[in-house]
Amino acid sequence: MTQPLALADPARVITIARAWLGTPYHDQASLRGVGCDCLGLARGIWRDVVGPEPFPIPPYSRDWGETGSREVLAEGARAMMIEVEPAAAGPGALVLFRMRPRAIAKHVGILIGRESFLHAYERLGVIEEPLTPSWRRRIAFAFLFPQR
């Protein structure tokens, strides 16, 4: 977006994100309490924080990020959100993780505090867990939600 955006209230983002806790994992879904994957979680939070999704997400395979070098998630987030340096990201920020060095960022989470984050994880569903050094060093991009 070309115009400056006002930021959504981080406390509101966190409250909305926590409402998704316990949602089962379901590939490509985005329905609180029913099922979601990590991208579906971010999409659902977007709808509650900002409003309707600005564009449809095409179907994707589980291994979509295993080949290629395009940072598809970062490009999409950059078009609608406010990018910040990962080290400066605080509670309520959407973060993108590289699951392997030099791989594209393909996992999404929401920072809950400086020491925890929320994400949808296969077999576990939506959980909140500590932002351990292992998770922290995987953060490749961070974005803030705009205000509705």
PLM regions and their residue ranges:
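Non-catalytic ligand/cofactor/substrate-binding and regulatory segments of enzyme domains
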Residues: 1-23, 130-148
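...with weaker cross-activation on analogous glycine-rich loops/strands in unrelated enzymes
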Residues: 2-14, 55-125, 148
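Short glycine- and Lys/Arg-enriched binding-loop motifs that mark or flank ligand-binding interfaces
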Residues: 18, 25, 31, 36, ...
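A broad structural signal for alpha-helix termini and local helix breaks/kinks
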Residues: 21, 49-50
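Short secondary-structure junctions
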Residues: 25, 79-85, 138-141
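Surface-exposed patches in mature extracellular/periplasmic domains of secreted proteins
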Residues: 25-30, 53-58
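Active-site nucleophilic cysteine motif
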Residues: 30-49
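Amphipathic alpha-helical interface surfaces
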Residues: 37-38, 42, 69, 73, ...
